[in-house]
Amino acid sequence: MTTQLRYENNDDDERVEYNLFTNRSTMMANFEEWIKMATDNKINSRNSWNFALIDYFYDLDVLKDGENNINFQKASATLDGCIKIYSSRVDSVTTETGKLLSGLAQRKTNGASNGDDSNGGNGEGLGGDSDEANIEIDPLTGMPISNDPDVNNTRRRVYNRVLETTLVEFETIKMKELDQELIIDPLFKKALVDFDEGGAKSLLLNTLNIDNTARVIFDASIKDTQNVGQGKLQRKEEELIERDSLVDDENEPSQSLISTRNDSTVNDSVISAPSMEDEILSLGMDFIKFDQIAVCEISGSIEQLRNVVEDINQAKDFIENVNNRFDNFLTEEELQAAVPDNAEDDSDGFDMGMQQELCYPDENHDNTSHDEQDDDNVNSTTGSIFEKDLMAYFDENLNRNWRGREHWKVRNFKKANLVNKESDLLEETRTTIGDTTDKNTTDDKSMDTKKKHKQKKVLEIDFFKTDDSFEDKVFASKGRTKIDMPIKNRKNDTHYLLPDDFHFSTDRITRLFIKPGQKMSLFSHRKHTRGDVSSGLFEKSTVSANHSNNDIPTIADEHFWADNYERKEQEEKEKEQSKEVGDVVGGALDNPFEDDMDGVDFNQAFEGTDDNEEASVKLDLQDDEDHKFPIRENKVTYSRVSKKVDVRRLKKNVWRSINNLIQEHDSRKNREQSSNDSETHTEDESTKELKFSDIIQGISKMYSDDTLKDISTSFCFICLLHLANEHGLQITHTENYNDLIVNYEDLATTQAAS
């Protein structure tokens, strides 16, 4: 928005002032807008000449209110805006003057150069003064307007050759290289952030890695020097082999690969190993018969697979055959080879050597060496892999038995598929038996079965053979029919229902129902001491005792588990009695989520009695010492929502409910008096009784359901106490303490008091 400005050296000053301050509404709108621009710091050297705030401040009309008094708050804001406008105008004058002076200097230099180059410089100079006087300046662009009519008709854009391109030199925008010595590895920085002094888990060594030379890796840029050296050696070997092969090809191109390998002498020892491998490969290539590869069969079942591809109806038999072979994929000899050594020395049908492999490594409680612990770690990893493979095997069998929802759908078999299947079976029997004589007859029979069609019977209705009792049957009254089975015949409600379509897997079965995050221990994970286990077996005395005792193992019935739980409870009671008072205060609780400490081990049903009592006692003591750490308290966070109740309104509504009950009581009493005029009333009419429950019931009608949720009996009782103090009410309880009785005097006295 532009306005006219006031200038002191203007002849039409009165006219400008008249036009500037005539419209009061426009003047106030401009003033408010300019004050807002000044407070928002939106005034700069470009738009400072568009604001006439200095003229308005000079007039002082906009600063006066209705009582012709100056508003000093507006005056201070206006003065601040005038200072900003004035300073911006000074900056604008400075920049524009600099541009003008630089333009004049450039024009002077250009004119001098043009004068020197031209032959008639004086004539042109004289004519130039006259031309400069006739030059017109465009007020919009500030550029001179040419007098040539052709130029005026076709306006041409003048390009500034100095600022023709906006690209900056690459060196100015190029990022400087950072100092590599001051750069911190982000992985190491993250490790330092995660490190605190909270415990052993947050130690710095636990967050860092260690290479194969037992060196702590603090930086991700550190690489394995051994691997780097091996990579360099491999590259050198490849280069030497390529160079050697090129030389051999140039000298003796007609010789075979074997002869070149034998004749060439290798001086470097590094090339010996790859050259031997190449010779072995070349020998193998000579013995391979490439002409028989296309004819050879990989497996005996490939022919059956091709038949299945040609005829899809044979797929079911082929899959069943493969599944049967998979079920019996290992023979007894293969099982003996697959099971570790000492497979024949087992106890209760379980391999003790395998049991040792399945034992997970525990802390080094005994004085065993590090090599022995490494062996235990290897055995533990193989045991865990074996357990996963065993789980996967059972999952595969369970998936085969589980069909899902599709299992209960009725399948629609086409007759053509059945006929084709019968013909295929006949052809298979013919090929197996080798009866070539019956070939034509079987083909004719199969073709006859395909061509034969059952003749459709014509439906005929005989109207003469009608039954006399037909009408009685049709128009007989229908009795009440039930499709449900009688209650007396029902044995079990779920007996005639389909089983739940639930897919069981070994992972689900081995997890506890109450605590799904915890798995049952499928195998015994107790680590036996060196005295108990020798090369994967218990002591010979224990094994011989178990073999000599050929008793049938006890069945894991309810008595078995009851005895185990009772024994466990007895052990816990003995532990509690043996503990001192100081240990109870300062000690920590056992971890309830530990596999070995969480009740009875499920493997006790499949294991024999442990003869080594000392080892079991030692293990129990170790468990007591190792598993002492506090349980994390599972705190439930409840949402706290503040109730919004208008207590003043509630108090008025309680008093209104009391008055409504009083009016109902009085109207009921008047009706009784009018109906029974002859009877005398001996009860005290000055005091009346109300129940607190009736008062609350009357309040519930005055609120909506959402508001009524926040109102409780406590709020109502507090309001009732205030009303009792104000109006002299008496509150007493009932005999059963299930309600409150409010005694009040006559309403007239209470209203008069209020």
UniProtKB/Swiss-Prot annotation:
Biased composition (Basic and acidic residues): 362-371
Subcellular location: Nucleus; Cytoplasm; Chromosome
Protein name: Condensin complex subunit 2
Gene that encodes it: BRN1
Family from the record: Belongs to the CND2 (condensin subunit 2) family.
Top-level division of the source organism's lineage: Eukaryota
Annotated GO CC locations: condensin complex; cytoplasm; nucleus
Main function: Regulatory subunit of the condensin complex, a complex required for conversion of interphase chromatin into mitotic-like condense chromosomes. The condensin complex probably introduces positive supercoils into relaxed DNA in the presence of type I topoisomerases and converts nicked DNA into positive knotted forms in the presence of type II topoisomerases. The condensin complex probably also plays a role during interphase.
Principal location class: nucleus
Sites of Phosphoserine modification: S245, S548
Phylogenetic lineage: Eukaryota, Fungi, Dikarya, Ascomycota, Saccharomycotina
Miscellaneous comment as given in the Swiss-Prot or TrEMBL entry: Present with 704 molecules/cell in log phase SD medium.
GO MF assignments: chromatin binding
Compositionally biased tracts (Gly residues): 118-128
Keyword match Nucleus: yes
Keywords per UniProt: Cell cycle, Cell division, Chromosome, Cytoplasm, DNA condensation, Mitosis, Nucleus, Phosphoprotein
